[in-house]
Amino acid sequence: ANYSNAHGTPWVYKHQQIGRLVGMPVPGTMTTVSWETLQDPTLIFGTPITGYRLSDGSYLENTQLEPDVKVANSPETVVKGEDTQLRTAVQELLKEIDKK
């Protein structure tokens, strides 16, 4: 599952044009959450307290981040210890090197 900085970190990476994103879309979940424990310490809940805005005033919350190269890891390959997303990311980097 992707949440919060699993959205914020790749968003900054793409927004700053540091490189290309490889993987699957990330739901827009970029807020700061305050975690509270109730009287029963097994009950914990999070309350969003800060939303992150772009220069145009729109919020990152509910704004899905799309990768440049969309590729999923299937359960069948994951149980074999294979990472299709990582392999694709390395292939994309090698293409960039070959261009130079």
Descriptions of predicted regions:
Residues 1-100:
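C-terminal "post-core" interaction segments
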